[in-house]
Amino acid sequence: MKFLISPAKTLDLTSTPSIDTFSLPELLDESKELIDTIKPYSPADIASLMKLSDKLATLNVSRYQEWQKEHTRDNSRPAIYTFMGDVYTGLDAYSLNESDMKYAQKSLRILSGLYGLLKPLDLMQAYRLEMGTSLKNDRGSNLYQFWGDIIVDKINETLKEGELLVNLASNEYFKAVNKKKLTSPLISPNFLDEKNGKFKVISFYAKKARGLMARYLIENRCETLEELKAFDLAGYRYDPQQSTKDTPVFIRPESAEPKK
């Protein structure tokens, strides 16, 4: 089983990774091409393109200028310990042991606007470039056109025949994967929370639930859909009535354990 998650806007650039091993991104030529495309942009250009404050735009312009194709432990950090946010709160990478991380390195992939596809321990440098950004480039008018089939081809390289691919990424990021070219069955879990008697997707909780499921798949070394359906962290449970073959639905009643 392989599974995908989104990156995050918020970055942790100071904490010490709990595992002192790393790998290198496989699409650095493409990353360099994107950096070269965006480097000439001024803070005002970036603020307009990404709808950022002047302060954030200035910070990210300096990041583009400082970005280097050669990634080392001096100028980079492993991705899984760098991204923050709701998904990564659920995943809680710092508490995964070495055996878990070894499994994650084989099974988990992080979609990225700049790096395309990252393994958990791939080194990365600080950046802000969301997949939905309309950045004109030599291959088109946005990042979806830039990446084309590059990401799906990389994913297919990792998949064994018949191996499940679980999509725990947001729509914005999974749109960068050409589903028609996938060589394996695709499973897209959905997480619903009860509010005022009705079950619905609540973004904050759904993001955290995706991270929780990624952690569950890692810790339990899940390989089948039946094993995935047993996910029961933080009060969620599989609901066969609302589920379909490719979209297992997990619900959490308001009476479930406290939501943190």
From Swiss-Prot:
UniProt record, GO biological process: response to hydroperoxide
Organism domain of life: Bacteria
UniProt-listed InterPro entries: YaaA (IPR005583)
Recorded GO CC terms: cytosol
Family label: Belongs to the UPF0246 family.
Protein name: UPF0246 protein Mmwyl1_3597
Native source organism of the sequence: Marinomonas sp. (strain MWYL1)
